Amino acid sequence: MSSRAAGDTVAAPMTAVLYLGLEPHLVDFSGFPDLSAEKLAAQLREQVTQLRAAGFDADFVGVDRGETAAAVTAAALAAKPYDVVLIGAGLRTAPPLLTLFETLINVVHERAPRARLCFNTSPRDSEAAIRRQA
């Protein structure tokens, strides 16, 4: 017999989200004159705050252009189990970062094979990308 009263609900566990992105100070902003490292960092902080307010257990992990990116990603994935891994557009869409993107996909595949992958076009649509896979 349950000790819960009729109509009581059990909260679903929070979806754990790892948001991988290029460290803002490493982004090439030449194609984005209205953006800067400071503005991008603020957008990312705001996005993580909004994701947490929306009920996600979200963590942002910034990576470099390849020197330690795989190790940093592997360490983040070892720290806790993630349900969804979002790889940001800055890592995914810049042609010079293609091999880094491939490396990160493979690290996620190896270290978190059950995690769903999703992709955004900017920090502003990260929640929609996560919801597609959560």
Regions found by a protein language model. Name each.
Residues 4-31:
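N-terminal, charge-rich interaction modules
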Residues 53-58:
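A generic structural motif
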